[in-house]
Amino acid sequence: MSEDIVRQTINNNTKLNLKKPKQKYLQFDAYDKNYIVEIKVRNTHYDKQIIEFSKYAFNSKYAKINDQIFVYAVAIKDIIYIFNISKLENDYDFKWEWRKLPATTEFKNNDNMLKYVGYLNLADAVTTIKIKE
């Protein structure tokens, strides 16, 4: 599964019209006039999903400055879990901590590095979308 499939599935199942940013190396993977969306595609199901503080902080601030909502979309197998981070950030306990994790999720770089991360319980997703193949 790819970010493109996730973005298109979200568009097909909501009123959003998400586009892929033209700029490289942004902290988010999709946007429309009201939302910015960070997309994660995971191969393994865990009840708690990691969110990196660097992406959380940048995207939360970027969304506020641009009067948008920051959404985190996690695709696991055939389900997309949607989190409204802009809403959660007010009172959600992300349980932030330092962890040694792979530098990237791509297999090119298996080196571990220290990252400040939090956790999202899948049960706290505002909605889920089934991916149809």
Give the location of each predicted region.
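Non-catalytic C-terminal interaction segments of nucleic acid-processing enzymes
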Residues: 22, 31, 75-133
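Conserved catalytic cores of phosphodiester-cleaving nucleases, focusing on short active-site segments
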Residues: 30-45
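Catalytic cores of nucleic-acid endonucleases
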Residues: 18, 41-89
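Short glycine/proline-enriched coil/turn segments at helix->beta-strand junctions
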Residues: 13-16, 32-35, 66-68
